[in-house]
Amino acid sequence: MKQYAVQTKFNGTIVVSAIDEFNAEELVIEVIASDDEIISVQELDM
């Protein structure tokens, strides 16, 4: 598992643990509002 900082338009930055970037995006999509969108995904150094 890696840590990813996922920046969204309305909710700011959400940090999630995921196996890869795609999985991190999927996890965030489940919790943000339907009108929100992901701006960037960045892997955090441990």
Language model features: what each stretch is:
Residues 1-12:
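Short aromatic-glycine-(Arg/Gly/Cys) micro-motifs in beta-strand/loop hairpins
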Residues 1-3, 19, 36:
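A general, composition-driven signal for non-globular sequence regions
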Residues 11-20:
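A short, exposed loop/beta-hairpin motif centered on an aromatic-Gly-Thr core
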Residues 30-46:
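Short, mixed-charge low-complexity intrinsically disordered segments
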